[in-house]
Design a protein with these regions (language model features):
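Interaction-mediating elements
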Residues: 27-331, 448
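C-terminal motif of bacterial Sec signal peptides marking the signal peptidase cleavage site
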Residues: 22-25
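Short glycine-rich, acidic/polar surface loops and turns
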Residues: 394, 729-737
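C-terminal outer-membrane beta-barrel translocator/porin domains of Gram-negative envelope proteins
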Residues: 373-384, 498-691, 696-723, 762-765, ...
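Bacterial N-terminal signal peptides that target proteins for export
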Residues: 2-12
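Flexible glycine-/small-residue-rich
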Residues: 46-48, 137-141, 152-154, 246-250, ...
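Gram-negative/organellar outer-membrane beta-barrel architecture
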Residues: 157-162, 298-299, 318-559, 641-642, ...
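Sec-dependent N-terminal signal peptides
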Residues: 11-19
Length: 784
């Protein structure tokens, strides 16, 4: 088997390296007009002292302003080979139009003193007249906002705008941009519509811009004052500014400046695709808290439907209540479509009727899926392991007519050793879960939670049982029961806060060791603290913050989790009769930063975690390590890819790599630090079906014991900040990825650039790095 793997790995390495090397590739013109110059390339060069990121952003915007006759269409038929399909005939008029378009954009971005020049050249190659067009852009100094005022000719609107002025997007000294002015007017429209002004729209606002002092043209002004203002205006030539005043476009449109109220709220919760709300008399009608519910199939409880509506009869119209109602229903995962319509009454009462139409999805569905895994050695097997599994799932999307989600899953699978002892592992598991679309807590707690500000709120109840039989080593039975709450707050579309709290998480593991495992535990005593029968009764607290940039180009994702087991429950003696209750505290944090470009992306990740066990075994000996299913590990397709799964570490201790009985043993630690950098880019499309992608990556990190208790076997395995550089491992490699839209397959190839096991030799840098001695990883979807 190993002789077969070598040529496969060599092939993958050569393939990935070759594809990466030819990314620039060649361009082959197709279907161009003969004997006429055609547009082969168009380049934009921006000059000036602009920051690199700002210059790149401006260049992208300018490229979008090019005339269509200067834009080329490149189609990748295979990595490195791109066809220039039907390139347009070069026309100087297109270049002149592009200059006008780009100047308009620069003015919109505050560059009123910009200059644009262009030139072209024609290269003859194989009877092709290839025209290259080059634009040189000198933006000059950009204008900045000076004074920003509201002059709304309606006292109520003016007062409301001034009361929320702190939220204005226009700030004095900020670079001028039409986009920012537009965003500020959108903010005002949203503010007004959230305060009853149902008919108010963007067309009702106008932004007046002024780059000169209006006082200079005032004939009644004192001459000395005019002279002072003139000198001030001249000084501003060096630092140009813009005054902005936002006002009503048509103050006479009085109907747009009236507050509207909601008369009726009519909800149709179970419409069929061919049903029409106009047939309402045929439906059963129920009124709950003034809300009219028209049901034909009686699929939902009226009280439940009414509780999800933030639109209430007699209340002031607020756009956010309409949006919140829409979110409340769509987040249930029970409806395939939800629409909300406001119907204005044809009288002078300034009222609307809210009509909510919902189309439920199929109540139950059954799924059957298969999965496969590949692993090169683990704690008790040294061969190549291949696993196959079969999954059966039954989902109910509307339990008890309250959109409660239930899911039942049965999985069974085997893991075979391709080298010997064919069937290595047999595993089966059964899980059942409920997801309630609300927080099920006592009223005295619920009163202190502002549920109206939450975008989603869920209560999660999970049950899971599993049986694993590892040939010659052990049989393992496990049971898990948990209760959890999850809530997401997202007042702004680009920012979300998600909290997760599990007050009760029970995990029981019953281990029946066999002779081979006992021999292994004798060789590696530390594993005895991890591999035994045990009980976890813990509470888990988690928080996740996601922020996306205004243009979607940047994204931050931060997650932190805390778990504690055995603190309070350890006081109940019956739960710890045989000292099987695990006591520990564990915390971990994960931060990811994404920078997306047009055809590539940069991703940075930092991860860190620590677990502190504080229990004692039945002999009174203090536990040294976390249970294996709560420990940290590194290596594999999702962590430190230059190492096999759970084969990195521990620290710089050579014990696990040199001791005969410890080789290939899984490494579990109490502390983990890891950092990753990945540059992702597109290669092209294969047969117009599969999107081929690639990546260059670097992984940095390791795992450690919190303490070794002075055991000489594990010198270098404990964490010490003073030897962090010595202990850190560094791996780097490349990847070939096939993106099928719904999932992505990764073929990663990585090298150990710094192996802490050999820290005595140049800190382990480039120890035995050879072309074919890399590590292959097969992964599904992105590593992070």
């Amino acid at each position: 088997m190993h002789s077969l793997c070598k040529p496969v790995k060599l092939y993958l390495f050569v393939l990935i390296t070759s594809l990466t090397a030819i990314i620039p590739g060649c361009i082959v013109p197709k279907k161009y007009q003969q004997n006429k110059p055609f547009v082969y390339s168009t380049n934009i060069n921006i000059q000036g002292n602009l920051p690199v990121s700002e210059k790149a952003d401006l260049k992208l915007k300018l490229e979008n302003q090019l005339d269509d006759s200067l834009k080329t269409v490149l189609k990748t038929v295979f990595p490195g080979i791109r066809f220039l399909v039907k390139p347009p005939v070069f026309d100087t008029a297109a270049a002149l139009r592009s200059v006008i378009f780009m100047n308009n954009l620069l003015h919109a971005q505050g560059y009123y003193k910009s200059t644009i020049t262009w030139d072209s050249s024609i290269t003859i190659k194989e009877k092709q007249q290839r025209a290259s067009v080059n634009f040189t852009v000198v933006p000059g100094k950009s204008y900045k906002f000076d004074s920003v005022n509201y002059r709304l000719q309606d006292s109520a609107l003016q007062m409301l705008a001034l009361s929320r002025r702190n939220g204005s997007l226009l700030k004095k000294g900020q670079p001028y941009s039409v986009d920012i002015i537009s965003a500020e007017m959108d903010r005002l429209v949203e503010l007004f519509r959230n305060n009853g002004y149902y008919k108010f729209s963007r067309d009702d606002l106008n932004a007046e811009r002024d780059t000169v002092f209006s006082a200079l043209i005032n004939p009644s002004l004192d001459p000395f004052e005019q002279l002072r203002l003139l000198q001030q205006a001249r000084s501003r030539q060096q630092n140009p500014v813009m005054n902005v005043t936002i006002q009503l476009r048509n103050p006479d449109a009085v109907s747009h400046f009236r507050k509207y109220y909601i008369r009726n709220v009519n909800i149709y919760p179970d419409l069929g695709l061919l049903d029409d709300s106009a047939s309402a008399p045929k439906y059963d009608s129920v009124t709950v808290n003034g809300i009219h519910i028209f049901s034909r199939y009686n699929k939902f409880k009226p009280e439940f439907i009414a509780s999800k509506s933030s639109l209430q009869p007699g209340s002031l119209f607020r756009l956010r209540n309409s949006a919140r109602t829409y979110t409340n229903f769509t987040q249930l995962n029970t409806f395939i479509q939800v629409t909300i319509e406001m119907i204005e009454l044809q009288d002078s009462s300034a009222r609307v009727d809210a009509v909510i139409k919902m189309y439920p999805s199929v109540k139950q569905d059954l799924s059957v899926t298969a999965d496969a895994s590949y692993n090169t050695g683990d704690i008790i097997a040294t061969g190549d392991l291949f696993g196959v599994g079969l999954n059966f799932g039954l989902n109910n999307h509307n339990v008890a007519k309250q959109a409660i989600q239930s899911s039942t899953n049965l999985r069974t699978g085997v893991e075979v050793n391709l080298g010997s002892n064919f069937i290595q592992t047999f595993q089966t598991s059964l899980s059942h879960s409920y997801t309630f679309p609300r927080l099920i807590v006592p009223d005295f707690i619920l009163r202190h939670i502002k549920t109206d500000s939450l975008r989603t709120q869920r209560t999660l109840l999970n049950f899971n049982g599993a049986y694993t039989d590892r040939k010659d080593f052990y049989s393992l039975k496990s049971l898990n029961v948990s209760l959890a709450y999850q809530a997401t707050k997202s007042r702004r579309l680009r920012k979300s806060h998600t909290w997760y709290f599990s007050p009760l998480n029970v995990e029981y593991v019953l281990l029946n060791p066999r002779d081979q495992l006992k021999l292994l535990l004798d060789s590696v005593p530390n594993l005895q603290f991890s591999f035994n029968t045990g009980l976890v009764i813990s509470s888990i607290l988690g928080y996740n913050y996601i922020q996306t940039g205004t243009d979607g180009a940047k994204k931050n994702d931060f997650r932190i989790g805390l778990e504690e087991s055995g603190g309070l429950t350890g006081m109940i003696k019956t739960l710890d009769r045989d000292a099987n209750l695990y006591r520990f505290v564990k915390i971990d944090a994960d931060f990811k930063h994404y920078i997306n470009y047009k055809k590539s992306a940069l991703v940075f990740r930092l991860y860190g975690g620590i677990g502190v066990p504080y229990g004692r075994d039945k002999d009174g000996v203090r536990e040294q390590q976390l249970p294996f299913f709560k420990s940290f590990y590194a290596g594999g397709p999702y962590s430190m890819r230059a190492w096999q799964v759970r084969q990195l570490g521990i620290g710089s201790s050579p014990y696990f790599d040199t001791a005969v009985n410890a080789r290939n043993v899984d490494r579990f630690g109490d502390i983990q630090l890891e950092g990753n950098i990945e540059y992702r880019f597109n290669l092209g499309t294969l047969f117009n079906v599969v999107k081929l992608k690639s990546a260059l990556f670097t992984d940095i990190g390791n795992i450690w014991y919190r303490t070794t208790q002075g055991n000489p076997k594990y010198i270098g395995a404990d964490f010490n900040i003073n030897k962090l550089y010595t202990d850190i491992a560094v791996g780097a490699g490349t990847s070939l990825r096939a993106d099928f839209d719904y999932f992505l397959i990764r073929f990663d190839w990585a090298y150990k650039l710094k192996d802490p096991v050999y820290s005595n030799d140049n800190y382990g840098w480039f120890h035995d790095v050879q072309l074919l001695k890399g590590q292959f990883q097969l992964g599904i979807n992105y590593p992070f």
